[in-house]
A protein has these predicted regions:
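A structural micro-motif recognizing beta-strand termini
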Residues: 90-94, 152
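Sec/Tat signal peptide C-region and signal peptidase I cleavage site
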Residues: 32-36
Length: 152
């Protein structure tokens, strides 16, 4: 039987130089990457002044969501949704909202199949959540749609 030996076409020394070159290229490009990352961290929605309300049943504090210039600029290229709704400003860690996965910064736009345009309408719909059936809550997180089911 003839033994075959595997021959390397790239030596370890050459591979190491390629790794170093890649690391240097990434270090050189990192200022551009961090700028894009910083833009992604800017808020997409803010609270409309004097619009805060609370949903005691779900355990969230809401305000009417107002889209920012960042969202307007990123909506088309990043395929982000622009909707009216209620921005969650805080979540009680012991409430059903936190248990269901809602977090600060989420924008609720539909509850139980009904669109909500502001914090007052969202709080009313959230306070109707019952104990016998799940209620679907649609929301945006960083401009992307999600949904959860809540029940008392």
């Amino acid at each position: 039987m003839h033994k075959h030996r595997c021959h390397r076409f790239v030596s370890r020394h050459t591979a190491w130089h390629g790794t170093v070159a890649l690391a240097l290229a990434l270090a050189f490009l990192s200022p551009g990457i961090s700028v894009a990352g910083q833009e992604a961290d800017l808020p997409l929605y803010t609270c409309l002044a004097d619009s805060e309300t609370t949903s005691g049943i779900v355990g969230v504090q809401l305000c009417t969501a107002e889209h920012t210039e960042t969202l307007v600029n990123r909506s088309e290229p990043d395929n982000l949704q622009v909707r009216r709704g209620a921005l969650i400003s805080s979540v009680d860690a012991t409430g059903i909202g936190a248990t269901g996965g809602l977090t600060d910064g989420d924008v609720i736009y539909r509850i139980g199949g009904n669109d909500v345009a502001d914090a007052g309408a969202a709080a009313q719909e959230l306070d109707r959540i019952g104990t016998s059936a799940d209620t679907v809550v649609n929301f945006l997180r960083k401009g992307r749609p999600y949904r959860i089911k809540l029940r008392q």
